[in-house]
UniProtKB/Swiss-Prot annotation:
This is Energy-coupling factor transporter ATP-binding protein EcfA1. It comes from the Bacteria. InterPro entries: AAA+_ATPase, ABC_transporter-like_ATP-bd, ABC_transporter-like_CS, ABC_transpr_CbiO/EcfA_su, ECF_ABC_transporter_ATP-bd, EcfA_1, P-loop_NTPase. Forms a stable energy-coupling factor (ECF) transporter complex composed of 2 membrane-embedded substrate-binding proteins (S component), 2 ATP-binding proteins (A component) and 2 transmembrane proteins (T component). ATP binds at residues 40-47. PANTHER family: ENERGY-COUPLING FACTOR TRANSPORTER ATP-BINDING PROTEIN ECFA1 (PTHR43553:SF24), HEAVY METAL TRANSPORTER (PTHR43553). GO terms for molecular function: ATP binding; ATP hydrolysis activity; ATPase-coupled transmembrane transporter activity. Transmembrane segments: none annotated. PROSITE patterns: ABC_TRANSPORTER_1 (PS00211), ABC_TRANSPORTER_2 (PS50893), CBIO (PS51246).
Amino acid sequence: MAESFVRLEHVFYKYEDAEKYAVKDVSISAEKGEWVALVGHNGSGKSTIAKLLNGLLFPEEGLIKIGHFVLSEKNIWEIRRQVGMVFQNPDNQFVGATVQDDVAFGLENHGVPHDTMVKRVESALNEVGMQSYALHEPARLSGGQKQRVAIAGVLALQPDVIILDEATSMLDPRGRAEVMETIRIMREQEDITVISITHDLDEVLFADRVIVMNNGEIHSEGTPQEIFQQADAMREIGLGVPFIIELQEKLVAGGFETESTVLSEGALLDQLWKLNSNN
């Protein structure tokens, strides 16, 4: 059996002066091209895992491996070449005077030749639908557009893994939808592993697999459908469920028995149509 592309094995991490571990005996894997969502309330350990995966922090115990490289002081730059991060606030990520300058910044730091750089910048901006804004000032973009440019900056570096660390939390619904659609298309085209750190439960529905964190440990793991079938268990640890799940619960309480938990409005409408046709 092929080894997972991203692996954490029995990882522990405690912040300085903290009494409890922020991450306690956590083992996680992700395959090439898989989308894994880590969800949990504040203090659950999910953002610490994001920092561990990119080598911003080193585990006290356990192993972290990206591709062929085990995270260590020796391999830190090899790890960071493979892992790109998109952070919460897009304004904190901009350094260039124009959109294309900003996307080129990371390539310049990596010593990429100019001709190659121009091609990569153009390709990355095309991929996120922002090529027509190449000469615009980043400050004049909407929140969703800024995050798409931030994603382009990561894509230009051609990473194997992209970590979204609460990347949509400061966006309005339209901006959030823009970014999620961009990530979905990017993953399909580039076969990139996506690890999204989020508390937005609707965002979780995009993932192939969900890992629920609680108090630094893995609480549960499964497909979005499997996780949200345990709605009461999610609420017990301070999390809610997506709107589509709440709607199904209300329908069931009102006497509409759906066949199974569904994750889209279209699938729910199909079930309601069948129920109506049978009556």
